[in-house]
């Protein structure tokens, strides 16, 4: 749209209601604004000293300047404060009522009133990312505004010209083609109607009233730069606190923020806990915070003026269908939720009844189905004047609270081993690990399930032998099959009942179906509110199995009578409940496996069942208190399955999330050093699609169980590179704030997504094969409407396509995935597109092909996306243009920054709440770092004691973490990393002189800083395994890996050099070393003893080595000062180590792991102490 389209304000004409009957209720807003001026004043707050000096010079020279004149003219507006007055009192009192509640600016042309709370806010940014009025509307979830009466447009309520909607986030303006008229219309449906063309309005020119999180300048002016400098300075954090205050006290002011206790935060979660009491005291308040937030959310969601459609279900129960208004609440309606329906009209007596939701809005309709518990006196003849209340149920929170208390006070709630490990008291080197001694199955697969691959067999074997185990299942690696096999083997080996849990009903149902295939006796326990909801495993549900029991005829008769009449007499009801309870106990005690949600495990019906083992699937999506509900049921064996490189739990309360409630138990145990067994063969994605996620998030360890031919669709679609079914379509559309005010949409991207989808449908792809992913709810809702109304094919086809958020697609897969990125702006950033876990999930949902639609110029500013975009560009699949004429984009990106962690690049971006957790220091315990440590002390302690020593700290390998002494100001000693045991002691450093200053900063094992770089120098903690580090499977032939041959050759050459030269330490070392090596590559330094496994143990005067235990698998490391060391022999975080240095790396006990070397890229330390990477020609 040209800026010259409009005439000056004097030439504007306006529609008159009496003269214009094109649209009923039409109205326009008069304006005095010159529409040729589309410039926006600067929002910078800073004024340099040079500007101030220039003004001073002009004042002394008598130079008159318009800017200077404006400053002097505005001096009268300045508020000065007498010393005797109360601070800030005179300023507040003298402000007019229409002053901005944030900053105090009160120019009528720059302020807007919120119609919901009647407060005024300005259109200036201050120090925030958006204007103050937009900040308020978003945070308070208000939507309507009125302009000031003394402003250019007068006192005007902003509303749609056609339908009268007043939500400013959906309003925009359209210029008429013939007349200089500005018409306000909502985005959908009014601006999208074809009838606009008949009104001489150009609907293609529709623009939102809000751009860059400010109202357009011609609508509401922005305060001058001087005005913003003189105004009260308020930060985004203060705005948040003020908005929270207003929810409790509408009259609260800025001064109330200074009161004590306003910004109190709950105690942060810890990494380790002293005992169960401290554990409960930490998580209990967080659970209560989340419960209070959830209660407020639901109780404030009452909706009025509801129209109802009545129906009767197959079970003869009354069902009310109605449509809820599109709210901006964070609450999502789910099956089984309880609502209360009120009749408040005059045609019938007042009535209310509770029901549970049996239908939720979807692509086919917005109706909500509510099955009433009782239809007595229901006003079925009335269809209007109804109100809906959301009923808050505290069941889940109560169960979490009880589980935390039980964990603290009941010794029988968990075994001693699991109790100590959950508190973080276990040793990081696993030397105190308990193994179950007993027969192992000869065949690890389960009947009627696919045969397991090698990594799956190792995971099953590992889980069966240990009381606590973690299994990491990357996308498409058969996590559910592996879990079902573990459950089958547990039942066959140990007997008893196994409890299987997951955070969501969908995940539980999927796992239940797989376990049922193995012919085990499975019972699915679900909440009573969900008993009427159908699912693929409904026949296994406890209530349905009771109905089908042939043994109890009396119960069957009473059940039939209750179904027919709806209720029983009090005597019959009591008898019915007793018989049903007895039948439930009988079924549960006879079951091999009981499946339920994590919270469902707190059901009283399960309290009497003795569980031998517990398996929690998708444990990464559960909060820690949620996981504790099944854990405290007394089992001796716990298996957690998940993937902490994917999305974690959802916590609604931001305070609780900041305090660490959003951290899962799985992730904390990983940080504590319990290494997960990773499944490593993916069967979902085309090999080209798996390459980036594998190398970026999983250290290149994912193998392809399918070949390209298995994942090739035979259809007519213009892939830029036919052998690579993927591309990134460059789209330059601008983002807009969605109707909620808290989300975003991009109309240009939506149009491109529709064209791509239509092309696939015309090529023969079925709608259910396509999935459309977008990170933003606003874009999801817009896409649903856009494709149904604007799509060129029948709307029914588009309705059958699943359009969902990234979070909703976790655990799902589709043949074709189309992703809309949405974000496209100059200054606001890319929001949670920056989350590496969210990107990982989005990239790993597709089986046959993926298409990403977005603005690469904006996305490439973020390092994570820069890697992905360069990956696509290198493969010539970064394209632009129409589908029929796709051409390689000429956009050039900044070269990706070289990451220290080139082996596990994704972990560079992974951040966790635990990164800031402080470990509890129990006086006198094995974690107490306040005292010195003896030579033989087996501890997880620091090894940075200063002075001249050699690996003599209290570490997990006898004396020093990882078998080496951390260098201090005068010691660069024992840098053996536990591989071959170069634990040289004392004296000068390895270079024969004073230790370099960078050594302490780069080479010590900083257990907290490895997650968050800014904390790198702050902590000397005891987290032996970084979040991104996991077990690799041993003895898998190199041919299975899609690694560059250059990498393999480099490792082979490196090993040959090591074997020829051996390990040595130049300079004056200590009196001897104690080390662990393999064969003759062990470091000399004392008497050599060779055990039966062919490993050698060297003993001598040194103190930095690690005793070799059977089952350990150690690679020999070359001295860093002589030869490049494989990166996997160092920590794959900014400072650290590789897993192969730990005992138990080899899961095939007694054999040597080769995988670290095969997957590594060579790295060496340069003269300045930084890692220098010898990158290969194709790093991906």
Curated annotation (Swiss-Prot):
Region (Disordered), start-end ranges: 21-51, 1062-1110
Cleaved signal peptide residues: none
Main subcellular localisation: cytoplasm
Record's comment on post-translational modification: Phosphorylated, probably by nonC.
Sites where the protein binds Zn(2+) 1: 100, 103, 122, 132
Stored InterPro entries: DNA2/NAM7-like (IPR045055), DNA2/NAM7-like_C (IPR041679), DNA2/NAM7_AAA_11 (IPR041677), Helicase/UvrB_N (IPR006935), P-loop_NTPase (IPR027417), SF1_C_Upf1 (IPR047187), UPF1_1B_dom (IPR040812), UPF1_CH/ZBD (IPR018999)
Record flagged with keyword Magnesium: no
Protein's name according to its UniProt entry: Regulator of nonsense transcripts 1 homolog
Start-end of Gly residues biased regions: 1069-1078
One GO term describing the cellular component: cytoplasm
Binding sites annotated in the UniProt record for Zn(2+) 3: 160, 163, 186, 190
Annotated region described as C3H, given as residue ranges: 100-132
Catalyzed reaction equations: ATP + H2O = ADP + phosphate + H(+)
Domain Upf1 CH-rich: 92-249
Region spans: C4: 160-190
Lineage: superkingdom: Eukaryota
Organism: Drosophila melanogaster (Fruit fly)
Additional remarks: In Drosophila, the definition of premature stop codons in mRNAs appears to be independent of exon boundaries and of the EJC complex.
Record: residues binding Zn(2+) 2: 114, 117, 136, 142
Coiled coil residues, start to end: none
Residues annotated as binding ATP: 456, 473-480, 646, 683, 813
SUPFAM superfamilies, alphabetized: P-loop containing nucleoside triphosphate hydrolases
Gene Ontology biological process terms in this record: cellular response to hypoxia; nuclear-transcribed mRNA catabolic process, nonsense-mediated decay; positive regulation of nuclear-transcribed mRNA catabolic process, nonsense-mediated decay
Assigned EC number: 3.6.4.12, 3.6.4.13
């Amino acid at each position: 749209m040209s800026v010259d389209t409009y005439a000056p304000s004097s030439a504007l004409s306006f529609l008159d209601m009496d003269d214009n009957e094109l649209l009923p209720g039409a109205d326009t807003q008069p304006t005095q604004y010159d529409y040729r001026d589309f410039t926006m004043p600067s929002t910078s707050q800073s004024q340099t000293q040079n500007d101030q000096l220039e003004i001073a010079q002009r004042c002394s020279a008598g130079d008159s300047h318009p800017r200077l004149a404006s400053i002097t003219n505005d001096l009268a507006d300045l508020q000065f404060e007498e010393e005797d007055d109360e601070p800030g009192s005179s300023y507040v009192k003298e402000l007019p009522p229409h002053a901005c509640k944030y900053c105090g600016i009160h120019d009528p042309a720059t302020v807007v009133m919120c119609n919901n709370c009647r407060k005024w806010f300005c259109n200036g940014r201050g120090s925030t990312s958006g204007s103050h009025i937009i900040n308020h509307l978003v945070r308070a979830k208000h939507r309507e505004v009125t302009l000031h009466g003394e402003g250019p447009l007068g006192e005007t309520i902003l509303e749609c010209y056609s339908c009268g909607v007043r939500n400013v986030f959906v309003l925009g303006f359209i210029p008429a083609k013939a007349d200089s008229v500005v018409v306000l219309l909502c985005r959908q449906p009014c601006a999208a109607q074809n009838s606009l063309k008949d009104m001489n309005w150009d609907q293609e020119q529709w623009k939102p009233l809000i751009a860059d999180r400010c109202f357009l300048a011609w609508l509401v002016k922005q305060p001058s730069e001087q005005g913003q400098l003189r105004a009260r300075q308020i930060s985004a954090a203060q705005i948040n606190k003020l908005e929270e205050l207003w929810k409790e006290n509408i009259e609260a002011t800025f001064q109330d923020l200074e009161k004590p206790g306003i910004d109190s935060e709950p105690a942060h979660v810890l990494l380790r806990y002293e005992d169960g009491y401290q554990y409960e005291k930490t998580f209990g308040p967080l659970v209560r915070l989340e419960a209070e937030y959830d209660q407020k959310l639901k109780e404030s969601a009452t909706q009025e003026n509801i129209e109802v459609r009545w129906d009767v279900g197959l079970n003869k129960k009354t069902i009310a269908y109605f449509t809820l208004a599109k709210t901006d609440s964070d609450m999502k309606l789910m099956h089984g939720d309880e609502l209360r329906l009120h009749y408040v009209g005059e045609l019938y007596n007042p009535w209310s009844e509770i029901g549970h939701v049996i239908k939720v809005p979807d692509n086919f309709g917005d109706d909500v189905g509510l099955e009433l518990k009782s239809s007595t006196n229901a006003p079925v003849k009335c269809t209007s004047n109804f109100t809906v209340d959301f009923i808050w149920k505290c069941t889940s929170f109560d169960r979490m609270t009880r589980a935390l208390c039980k964990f603290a006070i009941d010794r029988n709630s968990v075994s001693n081993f699991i109790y100590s490990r959950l508190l973080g008291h276990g040793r990081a080197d696993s030397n105190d690990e308990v193994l179950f001694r007993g027969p192992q199955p000869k065949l690890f697969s389960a009947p009627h399930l696919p045969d397991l691959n090698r990594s799956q067999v190792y995971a099953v074997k590992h889980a069966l032998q240990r009381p606590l185990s973690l299994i990491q299942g990357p996308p498409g690696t058969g996590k559910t099959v592996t879990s079902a096999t573990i459950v089958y083997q547990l039942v066959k080996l140990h007997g008893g009942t196994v409890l299987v849990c997951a955070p969501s009903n969908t995940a539980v149902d999927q796992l239940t179906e797989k376990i049922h295939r193995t012919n085990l006796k499975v019972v699915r326990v679900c909440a009573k509110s969900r008993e009427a909801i159908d699912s693929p495993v409904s026949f296994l549900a406890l209530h349905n199995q009771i109905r089908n029991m042939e043994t109890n005829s009396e119960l069957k008769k009473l059940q039939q009578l209750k179904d027919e009449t709806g209720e029983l007499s009090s005597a019959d009801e009591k008898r019915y409940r007793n018989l049903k309870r007895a039948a439930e106990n009988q079924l549960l005690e006879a079951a091999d496996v009981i499946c339920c949600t994590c919270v469902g495990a707190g059901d009283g019906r399960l309290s009497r069942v003795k569980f031998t083992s517990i398996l929690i699937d998708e444990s990464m999506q559960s909060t820690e208190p949620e996981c504790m509900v099944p854990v405290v049921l007394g089992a001796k064996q716990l298996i957690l399955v998940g993937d902490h490189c994917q999305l974690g739990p959802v916590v609604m309360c931001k305070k609780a999330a900041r305090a660490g409630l959003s951290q899962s138990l799985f992730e904390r145990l990983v940080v504590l050093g319990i290494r997960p067994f990773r499944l490593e063969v993916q069967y979902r994605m085309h090999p080209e699609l798996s390459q980036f996620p594998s190398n970026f998030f999983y250290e290149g360890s994912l193998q392809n169980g399918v070949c390209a031919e298995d994942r090739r669709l035979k259809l007519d679609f213009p892939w830029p590179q036919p052998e690579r079914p993927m591309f990134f379509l460059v789209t330059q559309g601008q983002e807009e704030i969605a109707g909620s005010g808290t989300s975003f949409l991009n109309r240009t991207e939506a149009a491109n997504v529709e064209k791509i989808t239509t092309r696939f449908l015309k090529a023969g792809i079925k709608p259910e094969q396509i999935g459309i992913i977008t990170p933003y709810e606003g874009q999801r809702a817009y896409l649903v409407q856009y494709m149904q109304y604007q799509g060129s094919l029948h709307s029914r086809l588009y309705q059958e396509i699943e359009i969902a958020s990234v979070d909703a697609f976790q655990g799902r897969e589709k043949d074709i995935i189309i992703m809309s990125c949405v974000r496209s702006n100059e200054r606001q950033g890319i929001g949670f597109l920056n989350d590496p876990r969210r990107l990982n999930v989005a990239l790993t949902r597709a089986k046959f092909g993926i298409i990403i639609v977005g603005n690469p110029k904006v996305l490439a500013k973020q390092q994570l996306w820069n890697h992905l975009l360069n990956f696509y560009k290198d493969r010539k699949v970064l394209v632009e243009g129409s589908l029929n004429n796709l051409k390689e984009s000429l956009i050039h990106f900044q070269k990706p920054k070289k990451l220290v962690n080139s082996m596990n690049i994704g972990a560079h971006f992974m951040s966790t709440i635990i990164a800031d957790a402080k470990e509890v220091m129990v006086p006198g315990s094995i974690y107490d770092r306040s005292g010195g440590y003896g030579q033989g002390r087996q501890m997880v302690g620091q090894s940075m004691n200063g002075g001249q020593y050699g690996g003599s700290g209290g570490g997990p390998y006898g004396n020093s973490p990882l078998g080496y002494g951390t260098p201090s100001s005068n010691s660069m000693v024992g840098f053996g990393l536990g591989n071959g045991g170069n634990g040289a002691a004392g004296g000068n450093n390895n270079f024969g002189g004073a230790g370099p200053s960078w050594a302490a900063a780069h080479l010590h094992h900083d257990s907290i800083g490895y997650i968050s770089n800014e904390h790198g120098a702050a902590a000397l903690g005891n987290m032996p395994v970084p979040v991104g580090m996991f077990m690799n499977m041993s003895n898998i032939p190199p041919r299975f890996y899609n690694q560059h041959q250059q990498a393999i050759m480099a490792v082979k050459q490196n090993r040959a050099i090591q074997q020829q030269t051996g390990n040595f330490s130049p300079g004056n070392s200590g009196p001897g070393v104690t080390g662990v090596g393999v064969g003759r590559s062990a470091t000399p330094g004392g008497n050599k003893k060779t055990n039966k496994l062919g490993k050698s143990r060297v003993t001598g005067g040194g103190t930095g080595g690690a005793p070799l235990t059977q089952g350990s698998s150690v690679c020999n490391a070359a001295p860093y000062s002589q030869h490049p060391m494989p990166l996997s022999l160092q920590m794959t975080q900014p400072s650290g180590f590789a897993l192969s240095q730990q005992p138990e790396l080899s899961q095939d006990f007694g054999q040597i792991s080769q995988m670290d070397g095969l997957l590594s890229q060579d790295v060496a330390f340069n003269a300045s102490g930084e890692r220098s990477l010898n990158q290969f020609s194709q790093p991906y």
